[in-house]
Structure formats: structure tokens, C-alpha cells
Design a protein with these regions (language model features):
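Core catalytic region of metal-dependent phosphoesterases/phosphodiesterases
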Residues: 104-189
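N-terminal active-site segment of His-dependent metallophosphoesterases
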Residues: 2-19, 41, 45-141
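Short, flexible loop segments at the rims of nucleotide/cofactor-binding pockets, characterized by
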Residues: 98-103, 133-136, 200-204, 223, ...
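Conserved beta-sheet core of the metallophosphoesterase superfamily
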Residues: 174, 231-310, 315
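Beta-strand-turn-beta hairpins that frame and shape the catalytic cleft
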Residues: 71, 80-93, 185-197, 223, ...
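Active-site neighborhood of phospho(di)ester-bond hydrolases with catalytic His/Asp-centered motifs
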Residues: 93-96, 121-127, 155-162, 180-183, ...
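Binuclear metal-dependent hydrolase catalytic cores centered on His/Asp/Glu-rich metal-binding motifs
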Residues: 174-175, 183, 189-228, 234-235, ...
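A short C-terminal boundary segment appended to hydrolase-like catalytic domains
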Residues: 1-50, 237-239, 294-315
């Protein structure tokens, strides 16, 4: 299987990095709907961490930790009438929100879960990092441990999340990933093509380059997949002709009501796409519940996961 990418020039990459770092240190977080101060998010994070500390003396804390370590492998078959026949049966391992530096015990659990999994592509939709103050090398090392037993026949693709600093792109490339920063890649097999567009995080670090990347139409009749950290570009991706949208960010709620209803999704828009399978117009989407956790290392009514998605051609 061949693949080619719309590689950014070194100058383009440098401009992206400078802009990203400026946003990371700025006064505002920027989403497709505009900019907002960091104060509200920081206040929310403090409340979440306080909740975790209040639970520590209770049996619920130990239960929540056990739940967070109880990962599952989700297997899905998604059928599309216009999927190229050469890609019928194409398998994608979708991971998101690993945050392994925040809960290192998960790395060995994930390694056991994923051992022996064979796929054609690995798609990592951001938030490799957890603790903003921790060195990213730890996150990368733990991710390498988690993926040790996975066999990936084709590309390893990644996008960045709101917890990932600009330096994470180079670190992931050192691990064998191709990081799509508002650009596209074409996979070709038996003369047929898949077109993949990956965006930098849009929840906190949105720029017009994300929308521009989606707006670029393939010069061929390709099946198009969007890789984005959050579901917040779902409407734009559907309008651009994407057939499949893979994302994470919400952790499925992480701490949910019975039945799995999220209390919070941290989405500023496209909120109906907060968990699992969904439809937006003619596009199918999947929002991962995430492998890891943020805030207190707890889960309730929402298991962490990795997903193997098999593409099928529907007659």
C-alpha cells in the first residue's frame, strides 16, 4: 500500500509552531466559535480535582480507580456505499486521550489489551500528554510501552490535542507517527484511494488553518476521513464531504450517571457528538471514551477504551 502526504515545508512547520506556542502562552483559548479566557476552565479543573480529593477517604475512590484500569477493546464494523472496494475490510486502531503520564499504571494494562492486535492503520486523535508540567518524554515512553504488542501494517497517524504542547509533534514523529497538522494524506491501494485530513486541536488552539485544511477538496473521487481531537469541527467536515470523523477529547464523560450519561463533555459546539457512534448529516463519526483519564484518576459508568474499526463497502 502506498501513501503520499501534502507535506508542509520547514517554513510552514516553523510558522505553525510559533503560532501554536503563542496560543499556548496567551490569555485566551480559541475555538471555532471565538476566544474565551482560561479562568473558567481553570476553575472547572480545580473543582474536578477537589471532587477527587473529597472521594479519597471513601470506598468510591478505590472503586473509581479500579474502573479506570478496566479498559475494553471496542470492535466496530462501519459500512459505506462509496468506500473503494480495495479498502473493504481495512482495519483502523483508534486511540485517543491516553494521558499515560497522569496514570502510569494504565500503560501495562493497555499493553495487555492491545497485545496481538493487527490493523492496517493506527489513528491517534490527541492528548497523549496529561500533566502540563511533566516532561513529554514520559508520556512518549509510556505510549511506546502501551503499543509494544500492536502490529500496524500501514501508517501510524496522529493529531494533537489540547493537552499536547507543540513539541509533542516532534516527539510523536520520533515514535514513528506521521503528525497531521492541518494537512492531508492520501493512501493508495490497487489504484484506489483514501484521503485523510488531520487537524491541530480546535478546542483551545483553533486557527483558520484548520478550516482551510478541510476546505481543500481532493483532486480525485476519494473516500475522506477526518482525524480531529474533538468533535467540534463535525459540521464543517460533513460540509467538506468527509465520510468518517474520528475524535476523542470528552473521555465519554469519564464520570457519568448510571446508563453512561455524561455530566460534562467539555465541548463548545457539536455537543450531540460527545460519545460513541453518531451521525452528522451524511457523515458517520466516532468519539472515543479515551484510554486514559484527566483530573482524578477515576471513572464511573464509562470504561476507558481502544477501538478497532473495520471499514466495509456496503452494496
Amino acid at each position: 500500500m502506498l501513501h503520499s502526504s501534502s507535506d508542509a515545508s520547514p517554513a510552514d512547520r516553523q510558522r505553525w509552531a510559533e503560532r501554536r506556542r503563542s496560543l499556548e502562552t496567551g490569555r485566551y483559548r480559541v475555538s471555532p466559535d471565538g476566544r474565551r479566557g482560561w479562568r473558567r476552565k481553570r476553575a472547572f479543573d480545580l473543582l474536578v480535582n477537589l471532587f477527587g480529593k473529597l472521594l479519597q477517604p471513601t470506598p468510591f475512590h478505590a472503586l473509581g480507580r479500579r474502573n479506570a484500569l478496566d479498559l475494553r477493546l471496542v470492535e466496530l464494523e462501519l459500512a459505506f456505499p462509496h468506500l473503494p472496494a480495495a479498502f473493504d475490510g481495512y482495519r483502523i486502531l483508534h486511540l485517543s486521550d491516553t494521558h499515560l503520564d497522569h496514570f502510569p499504571e494504565l500503560a501495562s494494562v493497555a499493553r495487555g489489551l492491545l497485545a496481538g492486535v493487527e490493523v492496517d492503520m493506527l489513528a491517534l486523535t490527541g492528548d497523549v500528554h496529561g500533566n502540563h508540567r511533566a516532561p513529554i518524554a514520559r508520556s512518549i515512553g509510556l505510549l511506546a510501552e502501551a503499543l509494544d504488542g500492536v502490529r500496524v501494517r500501514g501508517p501510524r497517524l496522529a493529531v494533537l490535542g489540547n493537552h499536547d504542547p507543540a513539541a509533542m509533534a516532534e516527539a510523536l514523529e520520533g515514535l514513528g507517527f506521521e503528525v497531521l497538522l492541518n494537512r492531508s494524506l492520501v493512501l493508495e491501494h490497487a489504484g484506489q484511494r483514501l484521503h485523510l485530513t488531520g487537524l491541530d486541536d480546535v478546542n483551545c488552539f483553533y486557527t483558520e488553518a484548520a478550516l482551510a485544511a478541510l476546505a481543500v477538496q481532493p483532486d480525485h473521487d476519494a473516500f475522506r476521513i477526518a482525524l480531529v481531537h474533538s468533535a467540534e469541527m463535525a459540521d464543517h467536515a460533513d460540509a467538506a464531504g468527509c465520510a468518517l470523523y474520528l475524535c476523542g477529547h470528552t473521555h465519554g464523560g469519564q464520570i457519568c450517571l448510571p446508563g453512561g450519561r455524561p455530566l460534562v463533555t467539555q465541548l463548545t459546539r457539536c455537543r450531540l457528538a460527545g460519545r460513541g457512534l453518531w451521525r452528522w448529516g451524511s457523515m458517520t463519526g466516532y468519539t472515543s471514551c479515551g484510554l486514559g483519564v484527566s483530573g482524578p484518576p477515576l471513572r464511573f459508568n464509562c470504561r476507558g477504551e481502544a477501538a478497532v474499526i473495520t471499514l466495509r463497502r456496503r452494496p
